Amino acid sequence: MVQISEVKGSSRENRTAAHTHIKGLGLRPDGTAEPSADGFVGQAAAREACGVVVDLIKAKKMAGRAIMLAGGPGTGKTALALAVSQELGTKVPFCPIVGSEIYSAEVKKTEALMENFRRAIGLRVRETKEVYEGEVTELTPEEAENPLGGYGRTISHLIIGLKSAKGTKKLRLDPSIYEAIQKERVTVGDVIYIEANTGACKRVGRSDAYATEFDLEAEEYVPVPKGEVHKKKEIVQDVTLHDLDMANARPQGGQDVMSMMGQLMKPKKTEITDKLRQEINKVVNRYIDQGVAELVPGVLFIDEVHMLDIECFTYLNRALESSISPIVILASNRGHTVIRGTDDITAAHGIPPDLLARLLIIPTHPYTPDEIKTIIRLRAKTEGLNITDPALDKVADHGSKVSLRYALQLLTPASILARVNGRPGGIEEADIAECEDLFLDAKRSAAIVSQDSEKFLS
């Protein structure tokens, strides 16, 4: 029997998350907010404030400052932070965490907080590399008498001829490069490049002038490099300070039995010492002074910040005042509440007053019924769902009376019911009503619990 199997495509499935539709802050060139743009609806004042923050971050004038997004649940705080990250682009580090993430049995909470601080600070290292690139026209090792005596001969240097589109060059190379060339199995007619600083040699492929040759091995034919043989290339690398910390905190061990056994055992999370971080900061500052690297302060976004305790807030105060610190964006949906880690100290948003005094607070306000309707229409389009106008009005009504999250969560089950009921036009009002009966919202569930309290365990 002939075996036939389907080949799965390599393209990823399109998944939609809660904030997939957010593409940016949706601001005009003068910094004012569009009513609806880049997937963002409403919250004009908050978006304009975030736009100013983005401009300050890009100008590198915002480092070491903290911003707070304060508002009720479902008012777009996380969406604002995500829009800020979209506006900044991929080159600026953006590290989102939740307040409860920093509690661990292995690492103390202040260490976890500092780790995320360092993740949000980038270092852009610019390195100029001198490269010799071309097609090999000559490869002659020159021998000399062995300095150790005897009849053997050693390679004193290597003569190599390289040809590019603009000319040829003959190079005299160190014998150590000859070993690298032998490893790469370079022969006359191959295209190679050699780094002048490190002596690293890489075989790119066979010159396409030899493409007509018949060979048993499948060769990759490449064109002769353009420009001169000797080139200067600027290479830009983006790393975070946390990457540097980890590289130095966990150096690769030797080849003895004990280090091999240590690598096989369950890796324990390494706690990076303050001394090591100070040493790395010294090296980073030296690079910045030399002009080799530049610091890119990123954004640390802490959602549900009221979950941090009093020790974390005290540490946050000190960390914000350090010379190398990112922009910190906090978000909380609490009003007056007890600060975690204390018995009876209440404060606005669950944050101590001394830290609150250092924050620039951006308020978010509940959405209007029209804005809720626009958001639901936008989400339905993002998820590829068709919805009729009466059904949209009903869902929007739930969004304003119950909650926006509940209204958005009704869309996908309603689309499945519409498909089962054979409605080609999309989601109708009856599907929303059926979903409403199947899935309770928080208020109705709480009402049932209070009515039938004796049937539940207390």
Swiss-Prot record:
Its EC number is 3.6.4.12. This is RuvB-like helicase 1. GO terms for molecular function: 3'-5' DNA helicase activity; 5'-3' DNA helicase activity; ATP binding; ATP hydrolysis activity; DNA helicase activity. GO terms for cellular component: Ino80 complex; NuA4 histone acetyltransferase complex; R2TP complex; Swr1 complex. Its main location: nucleus. It is an enzyme of class 3 (hydrolase). It comes from the Eukaryota. It is found in: Nucleus. It holds the Pfam family TIP49. May form heterododecamers with RVB2. Component of the SWR1 chromatin remodeling complex, the INO80 chromatin remodeling complex, and of the R2TP complex. Residues 1-31 are annotated as: Disordered. Gene3D superfamilies: 1.10.8.60, P-loop containing nucleotide triphosphate hydrolases, RuvB-like helicase, domain II. Keywords: Activator, ATP-binding, Chromatin regulator, DNA damage, DNA repair, Helicase, Hydrolase, Nucleotide-binding, Nucleus, Transcription, Transcription regulation. DNA helicase which participates in several chromatin remodeling complexes, including the SWR1 and the INO80 complexes. The SWR1 complex mediates the ATP-dependent exchange of histone H2A for the H2A variant HZT1 leading to transcriptional regulation of selected genes by chromatin remodeling. The INO80 complex remodels chromatin by shifting nucleosomes and is involved in DNA repair. Also involved in pre-rRNA processing. It comes from Aspergillus fumigatus (strain ATCC MYA-4609 / CBS 101355 / FGSC A1100 / Af293). Belongs to the RuvB family. ATP binds at residues 71-78. The keyword DNA repair applies. GO terms for biological process: box C/D snoRNP assembly; chromatin remodeling; DNA repair; regulation of transcription by RNA polymerase II. The keyword Cytoplasm does not apply. It catalyses: ATP + H2O = ADP + phosphate + H(+). Disulfide bonds: none annotated. The gene is rvb1.
